[in-house]
Amino acid sequence: MSYEVTLTPEAKRDLREIYRYIAVELQSEQNANGQLDRLEETILKLDEMPERFRVYDREPWRSRNLRVMPVDNYLVFYIPDHQVKTVTVLRIMY
């Protein structure tokens, strides 16, 4: 069963900031593009089997089924909702 993957405004801002930091601060637009591509591709793969990554082990997040997916040096925090078949990406952090 396929899930719809959505990003919160905060997660979208995180992606923009990751790109900006690598492209501007580290002066590597090519690496910024590559990192953004890897993050986006991996996030979109959450449409299948979103439960495959571990549950965040602290309350109140554990009881809300918050999950953590590593991508390179980043962590993608998301919540799958099985009732409506959605995955909501909350944040992307270094």
How does the language model describe each region?
Residues 1-65:
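Basic, Lys/Arg-enriched alpha-helical interface segments
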Residues 26, 71-94:
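Enriched for short, Lys/Arg-rich terminal
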